[in-house]
Amino acid sequence: MLLWLAAALVDLSALDATVRLDIRYATANNFLGRPVYAQARAFLRPEVAQSLVAAHAAVKTKGFGLLIFDAYRPLSVTRLFWNELPPEKRRFVANPAKGSNHNRGCAVDVSLYDLASGREVAMPSPYDEMSERASANFAGGPALARSLRDLLRSALEASGFRVYRGEWWHFDHHDCPRYSVLDLSFEALDAVSSLR
């Protein structure tokens, strides 16, 4: 059963190579300061990936592209996040007792990049910042940053996603409740894919 569930994840890069990846947990550029993924990959449920590609097409008409920071995340990584953070910061990560929508392959952490320059755009806060500036409705900061955050949100919501209010970058697909939590590495997902 678990293998069948894992086979239901697709590599986002195989669907649209113009969706850019900056998988922060495969680098030291994250709140832990060290890599936790062996590979910089983005896996999602097929329906979720198709919705994300549709949102990417929408922002391309405005001169931007989607920049993916994280997608499917093994449950063991969610446990690691929980255990590494002090209790007062745990509100910024999912409780591993329940699992997260990242663990289901139906959540994505995403920003925008400028198609002309190829650079990531400025948002009201950096990715993974654990502060009020990360809120999807934060009213401070530069107007342009808020405008770009709202463009991202509008495109994702029009494609079937809902923003997580505490993080402007985190979007859950409306189909999340139907998916099970998984705890398979990217390498294990590749092995399952090769059996198809």
What are these regions (language model features)?
Residues 74:
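Segments that shape or occlude catalytic/ligand-binding pockets
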Residues 4-71, 81-166, 174-196:
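Extracytoplasmic cell-surface/polysaccharide-interacting catalytic and binding patches
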Residues 171:
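Conserved metal-phosphate-binding beta-hairpin within the catalytic cores
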